[in-house]
UniProtKB/Swiss-Prot annotation:
Organism whose genome encodes this protein: Acetobacter pasteurianus (strain NBRC 105184 / IFO 3283-01)
Name of this chain's protein: Co-chaperonin GroES
Protein's cellular compartments: Cytoplasm
GO cellular component, one term: cytoplasm
PROSITE patterns to which the protein is assigned, alphabetical: CHAPERONINS_CPN10
Alphabetical list of SMART domains matching this protein: Cpn10
Assembly behavior: Heptamer of 7 subunits arranged in a ring. Interacts with the chaperonin GroEL.
Any Pfam family matching the protein: Cpn10
The UniProt record lists the keyword Hydrolase: no
Length: 97
């Protein structure tokens, strides 16, 4: 992957694949599937500046599995891969195993 470094408090997220089947075994076609709201953090910016001008580091890091809002982020294509760029505040939480 091309080296891409987000600025400020922005985060690059790769969507994780959604379910292809319902609980009853019905296969959902791609056109009817909702976009997943879960993804893996690929890269993070250095952080936002506070009122004193100091950089405040982000709470998420590359490799974290996160949940975000349905309409969060801007879709971009880097090296042919569909990714999302969003602010850290668009992330609702980190999923832990």
């Amino acid at each position: 992957m091309t080296k891409f470094r987000p600025l400020h408090d922005r985060v690059v997220v790769r969507r994780l694949e959604g379910e292809q089947k319902t609980a009853g075994g019905i296969i959902i076609p791609d056109t009817a599937q909702e976009k997943p709201m879960e993804g893996e953090v690929v890269a993070v910016g250095p952080g936002a500046r506070n009122e004193q001008g100091q950089i405040v580091a982000l709470d998420v890091k590359a490799g974290d599995r996160v949940l975000f809002g349905k309409w969060s982020g801007t879709e971009v294509k880097i090296d042919g891969e569909e990714l999302l760029i969003m602010k850290e505040s668009d992330i609702m939480g980190v999923v832990t195993a």
